[in-house]
Amino acid sequence: MLFPTEFDVIVVGGGHAGTEAALASARMGAKTLLLTHNIETLGQMSCNPSIGGIGKGHLVKEVDALGGAMAAATDESGIQFRILNSSKGPAVRATRAQADRILYKAAIRHRLENQPNLWLFQQAVDDLMVEGDRVVGAVTQIGIRFRARAVVLTAGTFLDGKIHVGLNNYTGGRAGDPAAVSLSARLKELKLPQGRLKTGTPPRIDGRSIDFSKLDEQPGDLDPIPVFSFLGRAEQHPQQLPCWVTHTNERTHDIIRGGLDRSPMYTGVIEGVGPRYCPSIEDKIHRFASKESHQIFLEPEGLTTNEFYPNGISTSLPFDVQLELVHSMRGLENAHILRPGYAIEYDYFDPRALKASLETKAINGLFFAGQINGTTGYEEAAAQGLLAGLNAGRYVQEKDAWCPRRDQAYLGVLVDDLVTRGVAEPYRMFTSRAEYRLSLREDNADMRLTEIGRELGLVDDARWDAFSRKRDAVSRETERLKSTWVTPKTLPPKEATALLGKAIDHEYSLAELLRRPGISYDGVCSLKGGECAPAEPLADDPVLLEQIKEQVEIGIKYQGYIERQASEIERNDANENTRLPDGIDYREVRGLSFEVSQKLNEFRPETIGQASRISGVTPAAISLLMVHLKRRGLGRRNGAAAEATEQGDGTVPTQQ
């Protein structure tokens, strides 16, 4: 058998973006090759050992709803699960899990090795094969030429990566891995707009040298234990472990200030911009000089290691300063550092040069996903990877690209922000970035996306069957609550007072009672001695049962707000999705200022909605664009009719 070198899709990179891209492309039926410099690091958690969080957990749930791997792998490797913002409204509740690094990698690799249509090969990529304006393949470090109609590039921090510890620096993609210098140089030859960003990681600590008696324990949620995947079960989780909390102090801060003269960030050695929402400890001390203390979370890296990740002290200070600052904190006085913290600078490419499909505008068939687009975080990378892999598969199948709208998914918000606004610093997802977050909750990610995923070919039969049962049960139970009534005669005053605070004075549906503050689904079902409960169990599986009850309760309690948001979405929909012609020259649009026409010509938005979110493009400019499109459409129709009349056939071609 000859060694295969012809594929439909090539994915370069085996991190969180690359693995989801390869799996999505292969699920689409495309013959897919995943190229990685080291098969042992597939799915590696390069920085913190956690998945999810505010906004990020929403992305993980959406990836799961579309058949992706991250949530399921976390359920198999998570050693602590928590629901953040559990006391707040459902829009901002988010799941977060600590993961065992080794188990997580194993779960991802198992899925890759057992995915039909997917080949793995260990080789770094040094070059892309480009013919004219389209990519046709990739060339590896030892000169193997793989051909494909689409290439998804997910290079993470490896593109011309430079690692900094104090004033010492060296090339690297992350600690222990080489940088992709040749590939970075090749991309620069393609004249794609690029820049430099920076991220960092803290020193790792040997747990045997930590005095836990001086620390505050932070356990996970135990009743119930959360799961990430809609198909997940708490029984899949390995042993659960606590995290621990310590704090910086004035001595810590003095040590850090004393080392700033050897900090690559504060001596101008690092030029790349770092993440605003995950700053280094030296940045925190500088920016929040009046703050006396910062909370530091000591997170276990896994069940088979003593290594701990001190979340909150990412740093590129010299190692002697790192050692001193760690020892200044309570419980860490004798801590042994296993690995030094460091910062890494790397190339990224302006995401405004991408289509919403994550295909580059300049080179057909070339897709970017993950940190190469200026984002930070495993979850943002995984979401982009799935979308890029899906659209690479659709590209080779000559199908239209797909991207969710802003009102449809956090993934839609993420991509729209990237391709219309670009990034000045590493982009992190928050719930505050979404205008319609009440409709984009974690709990309904499957309701929003799984049917679409099924149509796209991403969702398998097992997921579809489970989703269909849940969807139908939610619908039936919602209708039952709306059509089941209690009256002052049928609901004893004592029972009504116990649940509602007073007896009822007229007829109510169970749905109306559930809308009252402080009333739960279980409470309503307990009325009349349990007669208000459904006649048959909503589901046999306890996890699915809780999901159904949650969906029903939120849907009824927030019905008015959700309907109001849906009306707002409908009003905005017409302009949002109006497409702009590919070849339009905005200098010819009557009334547009020079600045606006210049920005529109530079960024080439695909829709009116995207154009409206470009900085400096005013509502008045959007109105002028709409007028121009109407005039242009009328002119094309008139021109086509006149041409048809001259030809004597009396037909008018349909305008696309």
Swiss-Prot record:
Main location: cytoplasm
Record's GO cellular component terms: cytosol
SUPFAM superfamilies: FAD/NAD(P)-binding domain (SSF51905)
Binding site for NAD(+): 274-288
Top-level taxonomic group: Bacteria
Region: Disordered, residue numbers: 637-656
Keyword annotations of the record: Cytoplasm, FAD, Flavoprotein, NAD, tRNA processing
Cofactor: FAD
InterPro entries in UniProt: FAD/NAD-bd_sf, GIDA_C_N, MnmG, MnmG-rel, MnmG-rel_CS, MnmG_C, MnmG_C_subdom, MnmG_C_subdom_sf
GO biological process: tRNA methylation; tRNA wobble uridine modification
MF annotations from Gene Ontology: flavin adenine dinucleotide binding
Residues holding FAD: 13-18
Annotated compartments: Cytoplasm
Quaternary structure (record): Homodimer. Heterotetramer of two MnmE and two MnmG subunits.
Family membership noted in the UniProt record: Belongs to the MnmG family.
Protein function: NAD-binding protein involved in the addition of a carboxymethylaminomethyl (cmnm) group at the wobble position (U34) of certain tRNAs, forming tRNA-cmnm(5)s(2)U34.
The name this protein goes by in its record: tRNA uridine 5-carboxymethylaminomethyl modification enzyme MnmG
Organism: Burkholderia ambifaria (strain MC40-6)
Gene (UniProt): mnmG
